[in-house]
From Swiss-Prot:
This is Small ribosomal subunit protein uS7. GO terms for cellular component: small ribosomal subunit. Part of the 30S ribosomal subunit. Contacts proteins S9 and S11. Residues 56-80 are annotated as: Disordered. The gene is rpsG. One of the primary rRNA binding proteins, it binds directly to 16S rRNA where it nucleates assembly of the head domain of the 30S subunit. Is located at the subunit interface close to the decoding center, probably blocks exit of the E-site tRNA. The keyword Nuclease does not apply. Signal peptide: none annotated. PROSITE patterns: RIBOSOMAL_S7.
Length: 191
């Protein structure tokens, strides 16, 4: 155990476009080598793709909502400016993102506990801040592992898959829950 005091919680400034602390933390999770503007472009671009895909699914079904077909219709013309100007698209993208994060958040995890010479995997409940942190981390990690061409598309498709209950991040959550369920016999070792 650490002998120092717990680190003080730092206040996170909300992101400039959506005014959401949750999204600001997600941008920080996407950020590499301190390049925040690049991370913002990736996240906002992904949310733009998510908003368009959700609008296409709910609204105009006839235009074709798959990514095939090249430059179909007006999708390529107004690629990034859409969520920056359209309030409805912005709200839709944020709701979809929050839904994806909620579906990826784990409830329990296993922690190693050494008792009498043997190590047990003890299931413990996770506090909310860690749930969100794990969900953000898994979304970014499994978006990186996808095969789409750009990180914008990878992240957008991972978010959409998470909302629909599939994808790598959801699989990771199910694996963590399965491990906790399998080791439920050791729950009385909880501390």
């Amino acid at each position: 155990m650490a002998r120092r005091k717990a680190a003080p919680k730092r206040e996170t400034l909300p992101d400039p476009l959506f005014h959401s602390e949750l999204l600001a933390k997600f941008i920080n999770a996407v950020m590499r080598n301190g390049k925040k503007s690049v991370a913002e472009k990736i996240v906002y671009g992904a949310l733009d793709v998510v908003a368009k895909r959700v609008q296409n699914k709910s609204g105009e079904q006839g235009d074709g909502d798959g990514e095939g077909g090249g430059k179909a219709g007006g999708i390529k013309k107004r690629s990034l400016g859409d969520i920056r100007t359209d309030e409805n698209a912005r709200a839709l993208a944020l709701e979809t993102f929050k839904g994806a994060l909620d579906k990826v958040m784990p409830n329990v995890e296993v922690k190693s506990r050494r008792v009498g010479g043997s190590t047990y995997q003890v299931p413990v409940e996770i506090r909310m801040a860690r749930r969100q942190a794990l969900a953000r981390r898994w979304l970014v990690e499994y978006a990186n592992k996808r095969n789409e061409k750009t990180m914008v598309l990878r992240l957008a498709h991972e978010i959409l898959d998470a909302v629909e209950g599939r994808g790598g991040a959801i699989k990771k959550r199910e694996d963590v829950h399965r491990m906790a369920k399998a080791n439920q016999a050791f729950a009385h070792y909880r501390w």
